[in-house]
Curated annotation (Swiss-Prot):
It is found in: Cell inner membrane. Gene3D superfamilies: P-loop containing nucleotide triphosphate hydrolases. The complex is composed of two ATP-binding proteins (PhnC), two transmembrane proteins (PhnE) and a solute-binding protein (PhnD). It is an enzyme of class 7 (translocase). It is a peripheral membrane protein. Residues 2-244 form the ABC transporter domain. This is Phosphonates import ATP-binding protein PhnC 1. The lineage of its organism: Bacteria, Bacillati, Cyanobacteriota, Cyanophyceae, Oscillatoriophycideae. It catalyses: phosphonate(out) + ATP + H2O = phosphonate(in) + ADP + phosphate + H(+). Part of the ABC transporter complex PhnCDE involved in phosphonates import. Responsible for energy coupling to the transport system. NCBIfam families: ABC_phnC (TIGR02315). One of its GO terms (cellular component) is plasma membrane.
Length: 252
């Protein structure tokens, strides 16, 4: 379990990105953060892995302790997979080599300069198979579609043998069919391996379809935290009230 205790982020210019965030994220739970652009979703995800350092509050890992301790942070990052909106892949490298990046945290810097052991390659190939891309293992990722590239990103995160996965707008640049495939793959893998997941989205319909739990975020604060079946239309309208379009009208 990951506990966020009164987490806050204020940038040097005085902008408050997150305010007094207190939540618990459970192993095996598929959670979606729902909110409009600028709500603080990406900042919250990055705080959980200390890619952005909170200016107040704590992130506590069950069984390990406070992430402010360097050794605890290193171990946490090793077992926390990240999936990014822009994939963060090496375009000219094959899908297999990109997935092997997920194994580097298990080796010293010197060892990682050489080809990784066959055991790691088997793990990477298995991860590609689980996202339906084994036949693309030796294909440069720049030759893959956007949806396929994001599935390589999932496989790379899975190769870390994570206890938790953080996904920042993983379907933002994908078409509807690819979006469903990526979320379906991710949900299935997390359920099978009891991996906790926190995924930021702005698509209400997809959050309602795939999430076990939805956290509504607006202007850096939590507006609601509940099961999809408990969400009221008024709560969603509060999140999206500043938008010029209405993503809610056909979802509830």
């Amino acid at each position: 379990m990951i506990s966020l205790n009164k987490l806050g982020v204020t940038y040097p210019n005085g902008t408050e990105a997150l305010h007094n965030i207190s939540i618990e994220l459970n192993q095996g739970e598929f959670t979606v953060i729902l909110g409009s652009s600028g709500a603080g979703k990406s900042t919250l995800l990055r705080c959980i892995n200390f890619l952005t350092y909170p200016t107040s509050g704590k992130v506590i890992i069950e069984g390990n302790g406070d992430l402010n301790h360097p050794k605890i942070l290193q171990k946490h990052r090793q077992r926390t997979g990240m999936i990014f909106q822009q994939h963060q892949l090496i375009p000219r490298q094959t899908a297999l080599k990109n997935v092997l990046v997920g194994r580097l945290g298990y080796h010293s810097t010197l060892r990682s300069l050489f080809p990784l052991p066959k055991t790691d390659q088997y793990i990477a190939l298995n991860c590609l198979e689980r996202v339906g891309l084994l036949e693309k293992a030796l294909t440069p990722v720049q030759a893959l579609s956007g949806g396929q590239q994001q599935r390589v990103g999932i496989a790379r995160a899975l190769a870390q043998k994570p206890k938790f996965i953080l996904a920042d707008e993983p379907i933002a640049s994908l078409d509807p069919a690819s979006s469903h495939q990526v979320l379906s793959n991710l949900q299935k893998i997390c359920q099978e391996d009891r991996i906790g997941a926190l995924i930021s989205l702005h698509q209400v319909d997809l959050a309602l379809q795939y999430a076990q739990r939805i956290i509504g975020l607006g202007k850096g604060t939590i507006l609601f935290d509940c099961n999809p079946s408990e969400i009221k239309k008024q709560q969603l309208e509060e999140i999206y009230q500043t938008l010029s379009y209405n993503p809610i009208s056909k979802t509830i």
